[in-house]
């Protein structure tokens, strides 16, 4: 038969309890079924045959109850009741199940349930909220990265200074070619100079053309023409037409004569500005004949 006073005298005062933690001010209990976490007579789960507590498992709250009738059966010592997710309905369930329990246990169960629900709500909020992940770095790696950053910054500043200096020299025509350095910047500078020189040349040409046109005289036709002038022009056109017909007849007759001469003579001589006329030369041939007497003696 279980006696709560004997158990408390044994565990609480005289002998050792594995769940007890003593400090300078107070003693605490590490038992998982402890209602308050304090080591005292009313809160001890081992020295109270009628006891109740609240536990949380995987985000769900349960009410655990112990009575003296099941003290002889350790396998069925605790009765578990699942509480509702709604806070008010869960409190009603606690009141219904702990109606014959001491008021202290009932009040502490409600207090424990409120604390558990509060930290569950906080856990849900933290999981939904985006958090920073802190990654530990060794001091060696940190120093190495800092040195690399400083070296890269110094190298970038040097490159910019060298580029500016070389661009200024190129603009001042200090030297013609650039060696051992990226030439992209110089190509850009040369393109800008060429574009500026082309625009200045075009402007100078336009100015010269405008100066040349100054004082130039031109003749422009008049739109108003008298009728007498028109009749004179018509007579001139008739005369020009008759003269053109005569010239066409003459040219056709000359072409026919040329074709006949070409047939008789053969090939036509070459025409061109480089051809020279040959001088007229008369050639005479003389034949000598020996006398007949000389021929007989021989």
From Swiss-Prot:
- Note the Gene3D superfamilies from the entry: 3.30.390.110
Biased amino acid composition, Basic and acidic residues: 249-263
* Source superkingdom: Eukaryota
Residues carrying N-acetylmethionine: 1
Residue numbers of Phosphoserine PTMs: 197, 200, 228, 231
Instruction: Cross-link Glycyl lysine isopeptide (Lys-Gly) (interchain with G-Cter in SUMO2): give the residues.
Output: 55, 151
Q: Which GO BP annotation is one of this protein's?
A: maturation of LSU-rRNA
In residue numbers, the region (Disordered) covers 190-276
Annotated organism of origin: Bos taurus
Compositionally biased, Acidic residues: which spans? 193-213, 220-235
Q: Which GO terms describe its cellular component?
A: nucleolus; preribosome, large subunit precursor
Q: Species lineage, top-down?
A: Eukaryota, Metazoa, Chordata, Craniata, Vertebrata
- Protein's recorded name: Protein MAK16 homolog
Q: Where is the signal peptide?
A: none
Keyword annotations from UniProtKB, A to Z = Acetylation, Isopeptide bond, Nucleus, Phosphoprotein, Ubl conjugation
| Recorded family membership | Belongs to the MAK16 family.
Q: Point to the regions of Basic residues compositional bias.
A: 264-276
Q: Where in the cell is it found?
A: Nucleus, Nucleolus
